[in-house]
Swiss-Prot record:
Record key words, sorted: Cytolysis, Dermonecrotic toxin, Disulfide bond, Hemolysis, Lipid degradation, Lipid metabolism, Lyase, Magnesium, Metal-binding, Secreted, Toxin
EC number(s) given by UniProt: 4.6.1.-
Protein function: Dermonecrotic toxins cleave the phosphodiester linkage between the phosphate and headgroup of certain phospholipids (sphingolipid and lysolipid substrates), forming an alcohol (often choline) and a cyclic phosphate. This toxin acts on sphingomyelin (SM). It may also act on ceramide phosphoethanolamine (CPE), lysophosphatidylcholine (LPC) and lysophosphatidylethanolamine (LPE), but not on lysophosphatidylserine (LPS), and lysophosphatidylglycerol (LPG). It acts by transphosphatidylation, releasing exclusively cyclic phosphate products as second products.
Cofactor(s) it depends on: Mg(2+)
Species of origin: Loxosceles hirsuta (Recluse spider)
A Pfam cross-reference name: GDPD_2
Record's catalysed reaction(s): an N-(acyl)-sphingosylphosphocholine = an N-(acyl)-sphingosyl-1,3-cyclic phosphate + choline; an N-(acyl)-sphingosylphosphoethanolamine = an N-(acyl)-sphingosyl-1,3-cyclic phosphate + ethanolamine; a 1-acyl-sn-glycero-3-phosphocholine = a 1-acyl-sn-glycero-2,3-cyclic phosphate + choline; a 1-acyl-sn-glycero-3-phosphoethanolamine = a 1-acyl-sn-glycero-2,3-cyclic phosphate + ethanolamine
Domain of life: Eukaryota
Keyword Lipid metabolism: yes
Lineage: Eukaryota, Metazoa, Ecdysozoa, Arthropoda, Chelicerata
Name of the protein this chain belongs to: Dermonecrotic toxin LhSicTox-alphaIA1iii
Annotated S-S bridges: C45-C51, C47-C190
Amino acid sequence: WIMGHMVNAIGQIDEFVNLGANSIETDVSFDSSANPEYTYHGIPCDCGRNCKKWENFNDFLKGLRSATTPGNSKYKEKLVLVVFDLKTGSLYDNQANDAGKKLAKNLLQHYWNNGNNGGRAYIVLSIPDLNHYPLIKGFTDTLKQEGHPELLDKLGYDFSGNDAIGDVAKAYKKAGVSGHVWQSDGITNCLLRGLTRVKEAVANRDSGNGYINKVYYWTVDKRATTRDALDAGVDGIMTNYPDVITDVLNEAAYKSKFRVATYEDNPWETFKK
């Protein structure tokens, strides 16, 4: 999965997919009542990027729905996975469940079109703080209560705080999650980070009894780092330059080992060599 980083304006969806992304990451900010408000990152953000592009969250969802609904004039067949980077740092811990409920209602109405031919992309809820695990239950309970448990098949999870792998496993246990887990690891492109924890996550994924199904590394803009991440065995690479990742995947060393994922590839299934 080539994951376009910080896609917060509707116009950027096309831009990143046209460069080779089959997945995008979108920032979600919340108001003081735990309502998802904007798709917005703000300053500081990655080096070489404009941090200030934004939409109202529900408007973005409608644009995203157009881009991922077959038959729509804006449809992009390649775009199959969306990571919502939930900026829950502005919330109190006791608001996490509410944030999950409100997020689910917004997605149900504006993205999934109340289950009536809505967007088809798989969705990952990415949460920066392990203490905010109740967000997951708030979200999943709401989908069930609203009569759409089938949409849980489209839903995955990530804790993005670079916490110890064992601590992340405990948070999922508390949240009642088993499966559909992506594990992120990374740092802003302005800084360097080794692959120690990525390798730990990959080992957990491949152990047969770990909690992780997929591993992605962020934010990768250089060819050398891309090669290192692929050599470590990641499933996804988040990038500001999807074309760079595409180029590396076309190199002889990687062409036979990797391909770009399509809608038919289940993002919750651990890949077995």
